[in-house]
Every structure is written in C-alpha cells, then in structure tokens.
Amino acid sequence: MKKIFLIPTAIVTALSFVLISCADTSATSSGEMVISQDSLVKRGKYLVNIIGCDDCHSPKIFTDHGFEIDMEHRFSGHLANSPMGRANTSVMKDGYILFANDLTSAVGPWGQSYSANISSDETGIGSWTEEQFFRAIREGKSKGLKEGRPLLPPMPWFIYKNMSDPDLKAIFAYLKTSKPVENRVPGPKSLQELK
C-alpha cells in the first residue's frame, strides 16, 4: 500500500521540479528583472524628459511663447556653427555665470564649456559603449574615456552619478535610438582665451 502512494508522490514531485525549472520567469538568476528593449527605451525616454537633458543638450528656437526645443537638432549639443558673442567675463567678479541664449554654452570660472552632442550620430554618442556612458556619468569623464578630461560645468554628473544602473541603461538605450544629428561640438575654452 505504501508503494502505491510513493510512486504517484514521486511522479508529482518530479513533474513539479521539471515545471518549475522550465517556467519562464521575469527575473534572472541574479535576481534582476528582465525588461524588453522596447520597455527599456520607453523608460529611458521618460527619464531623459524628467531630468532635463534637453535643457542644455538641445538648441532652442525662440517663439512668441518663449523658447522651444529645436526638434530638428534635438540632443545635438551646442551647434558648431552657432554665432557666439564675446563673453563679458567681468560679471563673474560678482559671482555670476553666463549662459548662451539657447542654454547650450556656459561661461564661468572654468572658462567656456559647450554642451555635448548626445544624439545617436557618430559625432555624438553613436559609437559609445554602455561602459563609456556609465564612466561619463559616474566618473565625470569626457566622452566616457578613462583618460578623458573632466566634464565641465554646468553638467551635473555629480548628481546623476547616483542614478541606478537600470536607469542609466535605460537612458543610454533611449539616446541610442534618438535621431542622429551630425554636429561636432567645439572644445572648451579657458578663461584666458576669453579675455
């Protein structure tokens, strides 16, 4: 009689193990949730919009309602052919910094910096690896290169470095799907070059 109960119990137990091991779970063995590429990109789009990447990395068009993002050049950074007036560095004595009228360039005690092209073009982050993106944000390295110069103000990388790995992955995934905008942003200028 005991054998009659043991055989079905063994079969049910074995089948349970097979079903559990073959089941499609939404988490990896490390416990991370698996997310589709589409969901990752959507999350990245949301994050890019709420943290204000467009504020500095997208040129603006002035309208009768104020300025709007120039969608033709979205994420292109400071346009290489944008005319720039001479910066009045004397106002920095009073503790001020200066911004270009489209917010893609700033002048301060560090000199003049230009917002980077973060579009998917090769002149932007098109050829970057995820590792480079993480290094740029986490370590404040230009172009995410180990030997790169430090990112300059006003880029708040020291705040963004606290974002989670999944959030940075999502932002990178979204930016890699953005419209490629060819634009070689000028290099920074020292304060001495501005005088």
PLM feature spans:
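Bacterial N-terminal signal peptides that target proteins for export
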Residues: M1-I11
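Bacterial signal peptide processing site
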Residues: A23-T25
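The canonical Cys-X-X-Cys-His
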Residues: G44, I50-K60, F133, I171, ...
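C-terminal motif of bacterial Sec signal peptides marking the signal peptidase cleavage site
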Residues: V18-S21
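Electron-transfer interface patches adjacent to heme c in soluble/periplasmic c-type cytochromes
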Residues: H73-F134, F158-L168
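Extended, well-folded interaction surfaces typified by the phenylalanyl-tRNA synthetase beta subunit core
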Residues: R184-G187
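Detector for the c-type heme attachment site
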Residues: C56-F62, R138, P156, K176-T177
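Electrostatic cytochrome c docking/interface patches
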Residues: T28-N49, I61-H65, M84-R86
